[in-house]
Design a protein with these regions (language model features):
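SAM-dependent methyltransferase catalytic region
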Residues: 1-141
């Protein structure tokens, strides 16, 4: 595995920008600001695949990356409630889908994702992925 300083993925770049633009002194306010920005970064990363094992590996990679960046920034692992919040976001943002039909593979059930609005508490609108692609979100009918 590549060390954090050598990674170039989109989420890695977002974490790097967050680290560069938030105070590093370990105060409660600074940690809260960093965490809010980090959760927004995770909320902005979406992906799907037909294969369930690829979905699992992608989810794991995002969650582990969050934990690694958190530990590097604050010198300790995130607490379980924080990990659970990230896991909830990741479970919605990385999903299994037939990309040609916008459905769960081998079914007629359309895939629903979250359009995140807040990080604390987690608040989001459910939208059909197909409608997002076709620009039919709740705010843009």
């Amino acid at each position: 595995p590549h060390t954090i300083s050598h990674r170039v993925g989109i989420l890695d770049r977002k974490f790097r920008v967050i680290d560069e633009n938030t105070p590093s002194e370990p105060t409660v306010a600074n940690k809260r600001l960093w965490l809010r920005k980090a959760l927004q970064a995770v909320q902005s990363v979406y992906g799907y695949d037909w294969q369930g094992d690829n979905v699992f590996l992608s989810r794991e990679s995002i969650l582990v990356s969050f934990c690694e960046y958190y530990a590097r920034r604050w010198g300790r692992r995130p607490k379980l409630p924080t990990i659970m919040k990230v896991a909830e976001i990741v479970s919605w943002n990385i999903w299994q889908m037939d990309g040609t039909r916008f459905t769960i593979p081998e079914t007629d059930c359309l895939c629903v994702i979250r359009e995140w609005r807040r990080t604390s508490p987690l608040v989001a609108d459910n939208i059909l992925f197909r409608d997002l692609i076709l620009k039919k979100t709740p705010n843009n009918k």
